[in-house]
């Protein structure tokens, strides 16, 4: 982030790290956590498909216990790593887990995460994105899988941790959005009156 700031001093520099669950949890957890400990002002987004899809379907730390995959034929023996809780304990000001079944919600969460990281400190977003090829499902079955896992008691019920500083940012963003909507409505009304 420092290099971006020195290279582009007049531009807002947001850093967003995009990685799969293998890179975030299994291979890169140490580096990810160290950035959180140091309060690096960037957002980490983990695309959690619960396995190593690019290399044949091996289990990842985020695979659910008991899940059977091509390269994990006996099922995973250990619980899924609770990464949102780790992010919270490591110093993230905003940490959440959700599925990609509701694109508008995903957009809102990511915008919040990026702005909180810019203004307050590190943020973490875990997005459940099932690999339908590896789990043997059709597209709509994958969507149903996400929706089912969001239900109460499901493994992807949205969890969210927000520090008081981050909540202030979220509240301000909501107020600004409401003001923009009211201004647009008033402008549209003026135009309608002028046309009539």
Where are these regions (language model features)?
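Active-site regions of oxyanion-processing enzymes, predominantly non-cytosolic
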Residues: 121-127
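Thiamine diphosphate
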Residues: 1-54, 108
């Amino acid at each position: 982030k420092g290099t971006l700031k020195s290279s582009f001093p007049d531009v807002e520099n947001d850093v967003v790290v995009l990685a799969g669950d293998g890179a975030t949890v299994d291979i890169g957890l140490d580096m990810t956590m160290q950035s959180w400990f140091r309060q690096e002002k960037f957002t980490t987004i983990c695309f959690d498909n619960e396995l190593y899809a690019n290399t044949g379907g091996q289990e990842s730390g985020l695979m659910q216990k008991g899940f059977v995959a091509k390269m994990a034929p006996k099922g995973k023996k250990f619980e899924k790593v609770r990464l949102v809780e780790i992010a919270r304990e490591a110093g993230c000001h905003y940490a959440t887990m959700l599925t990609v079944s509701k694109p508008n919600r995903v957009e809102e969460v990511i915008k919040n995460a990026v702005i909180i990281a810019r203004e307050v400190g590190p943020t973490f977003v875990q997005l459940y994105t099932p690999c339908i090829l590896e789990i043997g499902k059709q597209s709509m079955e994958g969507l149903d899988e996400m929706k089912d896992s969001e239900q109460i008691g499901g493994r992807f019920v949205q969890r969210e941790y927000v520090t008081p500083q981050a909540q202030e940012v979220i509240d301000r963003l909501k107020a600004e959005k409401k003001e923009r909507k009211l201004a647009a409505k008033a402008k549209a009304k003026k135009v309608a009156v002028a046309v009539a």
